[in-house]
Each structure stands twice: as C-alpha cells, then as structure tokens.
Amino acid sequence: WKALILGTRMAAQEYNATIEIKAPTEENDVERQNELLKEAIEEGPDAILISPSSFTESNKILDEAKEKGIRISFIDSYTEEPVQDLTVATNNLEAGEKLGKFAASLLGPDDQIAIVAHVKGVSTAVEREEGFRKGLGDLADNIVDVVYCDSQYEKSRKLTIELMEKYPNLKMVAG
C-alpha cells in the first residue's frame, strides 16, 4: 500500500490535485472502512479511490457516493455491485490458477494441501482460491483446510504452524 500511496501523492502533485488518505489500521476492518467512506462522502470529493475490504458490506454507501456524483475507482478488489468508474486490479483468478497448476506439478495424488489466505470474503481472496482450485484440477479435493491471516505476517506464521500440527501429512501450504 505504501507504493500506491506514494504514487497517488506524486500524481496529485503533478496534476495539482488535493488528496486526503483515509484508511483503517487493519485491512479486514470493514466497519472502520465504511465509517471513513461515509466521512469522505460527506466532504464531497470529486472522486474516491478504494480497495473494498468486503464484497458486500460497502454497497449501499458506495451507491450514495454515486448518487452524489462522486467518481469511484477500485484498487485490486471490488464489490458485488458494479458501482465503480474504474478498476485497477490483478487478475486473481489467473494468478491463482497458475499457482494451482504449478502446485499440481509438485504434488502426488494423495498429498494434503492447506491454504493460508489474506482476508476472508474479500474478492481477491475468493478469486485466488477459486483459481488455485481450478489449477489443481482433481487435486483440489486434497485441500484439507483454508484459514485467513488478515494480511498479518505473524498471524500467517502461527496459522501455518497450527496447520502443520493439525495435519501431520500436509505436503503444501499455499498462500
């Protein structure tokens, strides 16, 4: 996110635009993101750049922004309602599928697999897992667990250790 913020500030300076950055401390804090989104809408900006932390929970608020003529740009994730004017994102289905195909080339027919994903319910995590399962093909049935680390390194480390203890025959942890 640091690179995105730096790039946004540079572009704002180049185009003589004013920006204000509002973000929750934790990526999975949907409630706080929605509070900040409401605050931003009340300030009446020309545009809002957002990476929605929920596929569903911000829809009504974003609809309000659209009704007020505020342009909406999504970064790397989106909501179930297509309210955005622009989306800049990774093709998460394709990325997940490529990882799944690579993983399948390393695994045997009975090898157990676990997934440590970033934030439950966010479109990027959903699509990456879907693509990964597709890439695995028949080996997708070997996925024994999916856990979420909320984009926190230490939590992902702890969850991975717990998975390895819970499934002693685990051959791969994908994330």
Predicted regions and their residues:
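A residue-level marker of the well-folded mature domains of exported/periplasmic proteins
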Residues: 1-175
